[in-house]
Amino acid sequence: MPKHSHQFVEDYDGLVAFGLGREEDENTLTYYLQKFSDDEHMALIRGRMSEEDLETLFNLLGRLMKQYLTGDEYHKVFLKDEG
């Protein structure tokens, strides 16, 4: 069984828009991030991104996880550590 899932983007049929309210913003962000991280999309875009953009995106994601996840959450939810 796969450890990772992107089911939200498959099931979501709500509004995809930003700035209309917290719930719509959260749903839109989840939708966009799951679409962005799709294997086919990533294979296409990562080769076109500058070294600076790769580093900027990597650092942004790391900073957000460090800010909003505990160490245990990072290991359990993001890394999917079993132990």
Identify the meaning behind each predicted range.
Residues 42-58:
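Acidic, low-complexity, intrinsically disordered interaction modules
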Residues 54-83:
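Short, compact, well-ordered microdomains
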Residues 2-40:
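N-terminal acidic leader/helix
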Residues 39-42, 75:
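A general structural signal for well-ordered secondary-structure junctions
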Residues 11, 28-32, 44, 60, ...:
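Charge-rich, solvent-exposed alpha-helical interaction surfaces
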